[in-house]
Amino acid sequence: MAVVVNKENVDRFIELSKVENLEAVVVAEVTDTERLRMYWRGKEIVNLKRSFLDTNGARQITNVEVKLPGEYPLAVGDINVKEEWINNLKKLNVASQKGLVERFDSTIGGGTVLMPYGGKDAATEQEAMVAKIPVLNGESKEATIMSYGFNPDLGVWSPYHMAYYSIIEAVTKLAAVGGDYRKVRLTLQEYFEKLGKNPERWGKPFAALLGAYQAQMDLGIPAIGGKDSMSGSFGSLDVPPTLVAFAVGVEKAKNIISAELKEVASKLVFLMAERNEDYTLKVEGYKKNLEKLHELILEGKVISASSVKFGGVAEILSKMAFGNKIGVKFSNLTKEELFGLNYGSLVLEVKSDVNVDEEFKGCAYKAIGYTVEDEVIVCEEYDLDLKLNALEEAYEEKLSKVFKIKTTDKNQTVKEVLYNESNIKSPVIKVAKPKVIIPVFPGTNCEYDCERAFRNAVAETETLVFRNYSNDAFVESIKNLEKQIRESQIIMLPGGFSAGDEPDGSGKFISTVFRNERIKDAVMDLLKNRDGLMLGICNGFQALIKLGLVPYGEIVDIEEDMATLTYNEINRHMSSIIQTKVVSKKSPWFSGVELGDIHNVAISHGEGRFVAPEKLLKQLIENGQVATQYVDNKGNIALDMPFNPNGSMLGIEGITSPDGRVLGKMGHSERIGDNLYKNVPGNFDQKIFESGVRYFK
């Protein structure tokens, strides 16, 4: 990163960088010579006038030939609706991408308003990425919305319409979650074949530019950023004309809605974007639709919405139904509406007591049916009676071999064992506001979330960036960490990827630091002599395991027969919301919940599978050291995906030391807050942080 700093502040800036474990050096100076001079090994190699650079190079001229698009090639013919419904879900641009999406941490920062897939079964694809604006203190109420739009088939037919509808699709998606299209700003990313001097090739980005411009003028919203890539050719291969539109907006987090169907007996409405003869939208009607939609979302009358995309209304009805397994009975839709491209149109779930004709008066719409309790999609007109499970299998099939979403079921059950004894005595010395030390190692990325969680629990927090850019910095960090541990009552090891999870396994860097004699002595003094607590989440749990603090309560040498956390059974990173059950009350960290309570918790890890010898597992169960286990939607201990995200033995998610005061767990209990995960039903607050603080009072 290049930063311009006032010359009086250079030394201060470099010192502040060192505090953050960053190297900063002066690489250039701003002068009044109006020339750019660059040196290599003391020799001047560049000397250019600023006025020359300001010209942005020589002016270039080319000929452009725009070909008119031919007959619209994407019309729906005479098809068998039942067969097409299933085949439609198998299309590459319709099929589930869940196995790909789960590879990316969707809850980092603790501000996620909508998970990528919603509903109790996490199966309904969402319209947009929505996250609260991050703040260091307090609770943010504002959320950002980001959506995208692009259809490659349209690009092959007409670059003009492709760019036009990329913007329409992105804006419609943003409106579907509760955003106001009038406040949208756009950024565009283009990608075209190598143009050379061919006028027809130049005509493709030119036409796309005109289409994008028309959409912006029609909607009154500008693109304020973008990126171009003009290298989409390799040998005889060319990319299709591509302009991907990204729409960005803001809205109160409380106003955001999601795509999965919510209630039985809701009304379903098809809000239609009508087209002109040239295949552009009748824009005034489209804008009126979006304004009405925004109004009804704010009034709580529209409770879910999804824009029509590549696979038409048939795609949307299926996907909206998957998340909560709520069925649909529909009618009054043509084959073109079911399977054709109807960008700008939406399917809405409307509360059962809403007068649809009155609310949508003046809009282009159809009342198309209602939701039902049975897990089916039914239409008498087309003799349809499709089971949601069968449709979901078709939806997941296309990419399942490339991006796996399941492992082989073990077909085993685990007997639930609840441990209700507690041997925790309150500390001899009470503390009104206990201090929490949160060391931040290279690769740690959850310190802000953990600090916020403890502050909300009314604790004093101190973050310490562990610096390793030099030997002196390393030694100083050891001394500072020791000092902070001795002044604190709680040690918090947050999640992340310490030292990039290398070499060969996560948490090794943290465990190496904590094996330093000064740190080791301070930790054991805290735990054994001062009745302190320690918590490790995700990467922090991995470090606790490697140290032996869980399950042994001591920093010990690693032996082959010890417990460990290893690679997820699916052999990739997993990010999702799972459910865990509290099965032991031994730890003070769980004093605020009841035995058997089930909570939702965010997980994001590649090495979270708990494994241990059978003898040790038996001891942990008997001693009440197994604190939490993964469970399914019925509350049963889960051994298989998706409920057990990593394949942990006995479904173990969290364990404690023998006395319960050291807790390690994979789930990110700190990633909670108001209006988060609005599309995933359940209780997210395990009260871990307030329980830890209350222990000292």
Where do the model's predicted regions map?
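Short glycine-/acidic-enriched loop or helix-start segments at secondary-structure transitions
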Residues: 13, 448, 502-504, 544-547, ...
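Short, well-ordered, mixed-charge alpha-helical segments that flank or form enzyme active sites
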Residues: 34-35, 231-233, 254, 542-546, ...
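Short acidic/polar capping segments at secondary-structure boundaries
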Residues: 8-9, 32, 275, 353, ...
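Short, basic, glycine/proline-bearing loop/turn elements
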Residues: 197, 278, 503-512, 628-629, ...
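Amide-donor transfer/coupling interface in amidating biosynthetic enzymes
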Residues: 474-476, 481, 524-525, 557-697
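Active-site glycine-centered loops adjacent to acidic/histidine catalytic or metal-binding residues
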Residues: 307, 538, 668
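Cysteine-nucleophile active-site neighborhood
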Residues: 498-586
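Glycine/proline-enriched, intrinsically flexible loops and inter-domain linkers
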Residues: 1-500, 513-524, 650, 655-656, ...
